[in-house]
Amino acid sequence: MQPPGPPPAYAPTNGDFTFVSSADAEDLSGSIASPDVKLNLGGDFIKESTATTFLRQRGYGWLLEVEDDDPEDNKPLLEELDIDLKDIYYKIRCVLMPMPSLGFNRQVVRDNPDFWGPLAVVLFFSMISLYGQFRVVSWIITIWIFGSLTIFLLARVLGGEVAYGQVLGVIGYSLLPLIVIAPVLLVVGSFEVVSTLIKLFGVFWAAYSAASLLVGEEFKTKKPLLIYPIFLLYIYFLSLYTGV
């Protein structure tokens, strides 16, 4: 009877590990196959992803960009156009009541000029000056722009520190006295003497309101050189209204 031999070598299956010595580890090679895993995220996601890829490949990826809402894009229309109705109303009161004793900060008309307020005043004055002739509107606006430019250049020559926008705003707002006397002239138009006095009063009112804002202390003895052309400018505005 033969003695029992050594037990047979254990052959590992696919699910077992095989331990080898470090000397034999250098001769080992192989690969691990990745499992085929598929996720079903729905047909809509696949279509959207395909469309996105298609657009990006052809340079239209900017169509897919989503911008955050900017609070500045939701401003009211008046704010977008830089129209401050309260500021315009305050400036109108400053022009119509130029007396310093009333306590208005009249320098705001000069120091904080705007465009829409004077433009509205000039357009309103043009409308009441039509007399069936629409070309009067464009003519009055032209006189406003170039008349203000003349006053601006004269003020700069005399040494005044004033901008063209400031002159444009002051001259435009100061047309308000002529607008105020317009309905009065319709009533007393048949009385020549009274009508003439009202016209002179309106011109002096407008010229004083504009000159008191534009003529500063820097002019000193040169004030008449600037007040006189302002007075002539409003006489011309009045002549466009009365048809003289």
UniProtKB/Swiss-Prot annotation:
Residues 1-113, 160-166, 217-223 are cytoplasmic. Expressed in keratinocytes (at protein level). It is a multi-pass membrane protein. The chain crosses the membrane at residues 114-134, 139-159, 167-187, 196-216, 224-244. The keyword Zinc-finger does not apply. Disulfide bonds: none annotated. GO terms for cellular component: endoplasmic reticulum; Golgi apparatus; intracellular membrane-bounded organelle; plasma membrane; trans-Golgi network. One of its GO terms (biological process) is endoplasmic reticulum to Golgi vesicle-mediated transport. The keyword Secreted does not apply. Keywords: Golgi apparatus, Host-virus interaction, Membrane, Transmembrane, Transmembrane helix. It is found in: Golgi apparatus, cis-Golgi network membrane. Residues 135-138, 188-195 are extracellular. Interacts with YIPF3 and YIPF5. Belongs to the YIP1 family. Involved in the maintenance of the Golgi structure. This is Protein YIPF4.
